[in-house]
Swiss-Prot record:
Chain's gene name: Tnfaip1
Protein function: Substrate-specific adapter of a BCR (BTB-CUL3-RBX1) E3 ubiquitin-protein ligase complex involved in regulation of cytoskeleton structure. The BCR(TNFAIP1) E3 ubiquitin ligase complex mediates the ubiquitination of RHOA, leading to its degradation by the proteasome, thereby regulating the actin cytoskeleton and cell migration. Its interaction with RHOB may regulate apoptosis. May enhance the PCNA-dependent DNA polymerase delta activity.
Keywords: Cytoplasm, Endosome, Nucleus, Phosphoprotein, Ubl conjugation pathway
Recorded GO MF terms: cyclin binding; identical protein binding; small GTPase binding; ubiquitin-protein transferase activity
Protein name as catalogued: BTB/POZ domain-containing adapter for CUL3-mediated RhoA degradation protein 2
Amino acid sequence: MSGDTCLCPASGAKPKISGFKGGGLGNKYVQLNVGGSLHYTTVRALTRHDTMLKAMFSGRMEVLTDKEGWILIDRCGKHFGTILNYLRDDTVTLPQSRQEIQELMAEAKYYLIQGLVSLCQAALQDKKDSYQPVCNIPIITSLREEDRLIESSTKPVVKLLYNRSNNKYSYTSNSDDHLLKNIELFDKLSLRFNGRVLFIKDVIGDEICCWSFYGQGRKLAEVCCTSIVYATEKKQTKVEFPEARIYEETLNVLLYETPRVPDNSLLEATSRSRSQASPSEDEDTFELRDRVRRIHVKRYSTYDDRQLGHQSAHRD
């Protein structure tokens, strides 16, 4: 499992360097902090291939740990989950973008994972003669397709639904202009954040103009831009352009760029090996975990009052 939060050690606490005694611990879970991205996996997975990670976890190289027992690796953790998947299965689905494949290959070279380097090189060669657009905006064709896009996306999702034909009444004088401004803002945001957010257009929905924001597979917020007003004794449809609110929700959704933080139960289960630590260290550890949980819940409570435990735990 991987996450996105790394809290700095307490003031005065220094990471310590030691040799990792990995003999006979193939099924033991270890916790890794790779550039702030938290991961759980077994020693067996890390030592299956002759790589730098095998050297680290078989005692041939020194490892750096903090006071909570996290093994620190000073690399970007963006693609480390993909690296773990390759180490376990000897194969992996590569990213679609050329840039991300290059980033993954750089990490694979650092960890001396030659098989993954070869996969990346072959994928880059395949893409060499074909040009992929930098900014792709899917237009959904069905509700099922929309659900699959949102659930499978590793990025936050922003969807704009606009369908002018859904109107039952006449429009107010500024509605067409506001509808166009919503579409133009969507295009501008798509160009600005296309590498960090998946933008989706919906032209078959039941609304006239509505923004939806998703993170980690669930809806976080919705901004509906239409309302019914009464003018000259008849109903009219009014389309608004809440620009500030749209910007606010787009920035909020960026909080969900990185994978889920490990939940509290998994943190406790994987830390039992340190049960011999002093009482003061145990108290500090539980206080730190609780702080991670509260920050995480606070971040979600803006949109969803469900407890953090609603997500099932997975282990790398």
